[in-house]
Amino acid sequence: MSGRGKGGKGLGKGARKRHRKVLRDNIQGITKPAIRRLARRGGVKRISGLIYEETRGVRKIFLENVIRDAVTYTEHARRKTVTAMDVVYALKRQGRTLYGFGG
Protein backbone atom coordinates (compact mmCIF):
# COMPACT_ATOMS: atom_id res chain seq x y z
CA MET A 1 0.00 0.00 0.00
CA SER A 2 2.96 2.27 -0.49
CA GLY A 3 2.51 5.61 -2.17
CA ARG A 4 -1.27 5.60 -2.21
CA GLY A 5 -2.02 8.00 0.60
CA LYS A 6 -5.62 7.91 1.78
CA GLY A 7 -6.89 5.88 -1.17
CA GLY A 8 -6.96 2.53 0.59
CA LYS A 9 -7.12 -0.51 -1.68
CA GLY A 10 -7.14 1.50 -4.87
CA LEU A 11 -10.76 2.56 -4.62
CA GLY A 12 -11.20 6.20 -5.60
CA LYS A 13 -7.55 6.97 -6.10
CA GLY A 14 -7.91 10.59 -5.09
CA ALA A 15 -7.81 12.08 -8.57
CA ARG A 16 -9.50 15.38 -9.18
CA LYS A 17 -13.15 15.72 -8.19
CA ARG A 18 -15.54 15.52 -11.08
CA HIS A 19 -18.37 17.95 -11.42
CA ARG A 20 -21.64 16.16 -10.93
CA LYS A 21 -24.88 17.45 -12.35
CA VAL A 22 -27.10 18.60 -9.49
CA LEU A 23 -30.27 16.51 -9.65
CA ARG A 24 -33.18 18.65 -8.55
CA ASP A 25 -36.78 17.52 -8.34
CA ASN A 26 -36.04 14.08 -9.75
CA ILE A 27 -39.35 12.81 -8.44
CA GLN A 28 -40.95 14.38 -11.52
CA GLY A 29 -39.00 11.84 -13.58
CA ILE A 30 -41.99 9.52 -13.49
CA THR A 31 -44.33 11.27 -15.87
CA LYS A 32 -48.10 11.50 -15.84
CA PRO A 33 -48.44 9.16 -18.83
CA ALA A 34 -46.12 6.63 -17.17
CA ILE A 35 -48.30 6.59 -14.05
CA ARG A 36 -51.38 6.27 -16.27
CA ARG A 37 -49.83 3.27 -18.08
CA LEU A 38 -49.09 1.54 -14.78
CA ALA A 39 -52.67 2.13 -13.65
CA ARG A 40 -54.03 0.78 -16.94
CA ARG A 41 -51.91 -2.35 -16.48
CA GLY A 42 -53.54 -2.72 -13.07
CA GLY A 43 -57.00 -2.48 -14.61
CA VAL A 44 -57.84 1.16 -13.76
CA LYS A 45 -60.19 2.92 -16.18
CA ARG A 46 -60.38 6.50 -14.86
CA ILE A 47 -57.76 8.34 -12.81
CA SER A 48 -58.25 11.35 -10.53
CA GLY A 49 -55.92 14.28 -11.12
CA LEU A 50 -54.66 14.12 -7.52
CA ILE A 51 -53.33 10.60 -8.00
CA TYR A 52 -50.15 11.62 -9.82
CA GLU A 53 -48.50 13.55 -6.97
CA GLU A 54 -49.66 10.96 -4.44
CA THR A 55 -48.12 8.17 -6.54
CA ARG A 56 -44.83 10.05 -6.76
CA GLY A 57 -44.77 10.49 -2.98
CA VAL A 58 -45.51 6.82 -2.30
CA ARG A 59 -42.86 5.73 -4.80
CA LYS A 60 -40.29 8.00 -3.14
CA ILE A 61 -40.99 6.57 0.32
CA PHE A 62 -40.88 2.98 -1.00
CA LEU A 63 -37.54 3.51 -2.74
CA GLU A 64 -36.05 5.27 0.31
CA ASN A 65 -36.93 2.25 2.47
CA VAL A 66 -35.56 -0.31 -0.01
CA ILE A 67 -32.36 1.67 -0.59
CA ARG A 68 -31.83 2.19 3.15
CA ASP A 69 -32.04 -1.57 3.75
CA ALA A 70 -29.84 -2.38 0.74
CA VAL A 71 -27.16 0.05 1.93
CA THR A 72 -27.35 -1.50 5.41
CA TYR A 73 -26.58 -4.92 3.89
CA THR A 74 -23.72 -3.38 1.90
CA GLU A 75 -22.19 -1.66 4.93
CA HIS A 76 -22.49 -4.82 7.03
CA ALA A 77 -20.49 -6.71 4.39
CA ARG A 78 -17.90 -3.88 4.43
CA ARG A 79 -18.39 -3.18 0.73
CA LYS A 80 -18.78 0.11 -1.08
CA THR A 81 -20.85 -1.22 -3.97
CA VAL A 82 -24.52 -2.09 -3.59
CA THR A 83 -25.13 -5.37 -5.40
CA ALA A 84 -28.31 -6.78 -6.91
CA MET A 85 -28.41 -9.30 -4.07
CA ASP A 86 -28.44 -6.48 -1.50
CA VAL A 87 -31.57 -5.13 -3.18
CA VAL A 88 -33.12 -8.63 -3.39
CA TYR A 89 -32.52 -9.18 0.33
CA ALA A 90 -33.87 -5.71 1.16
CA LEU A 91 -37.06 -6.42 -0.79
CA LYS A 92 -37.39 -9.85 0.83
CA ARG A 93 -37.07 -8.25 4.26
CA GLN A 94 -40.01 -6.01 3.40
CA GLY A 95 -42.10 -8.98 2.28
CA ARG A 96 -41.71 -8.40 -1.48
CA THR A 97 -39.70 -11.37 -2.70
CA LEU A 98 -38.13 -10.79 -6.11
CA TYR A 99 -37.02 -13.71 -8.29
CA GLY A 100 -34.57 -13.77 -11.16
CA PHE A 101 -31.61 -11.81 -9.78
CA GLY A 102 -29.56 -14.59 -8.18
CA GLY A 103 -29.63 -16.25 -4.80
Swiss-Prot record:
GO terms under biological process: nucleosome assembly
GO CC, any one term: nucleus
GO MF term (any one): protein heterodimerization activity
Keyword terms of this UniProt record: Acetylation, Chromosome, DNA-binding, Methylation, Nucleosome core, Nucleus
List of residues that carry N-acetylserine: 2
Gene3D superfamilies in UniProt: Histone, subunit A
SUPFAM superfamilies from the UniProt entry: Histone-fold
Annotation: DNA-binding region: 17-21
Residues with the N6-methyllysine modification: 21
The protein's name: Histone H4.3
Originating species: Zea mays (Maize)
Top-level taxonomy: Eukaryota, Viridiplantae, Streptophyta, Embryophyta, Tracheophyta
Gene encoding the protein: H4
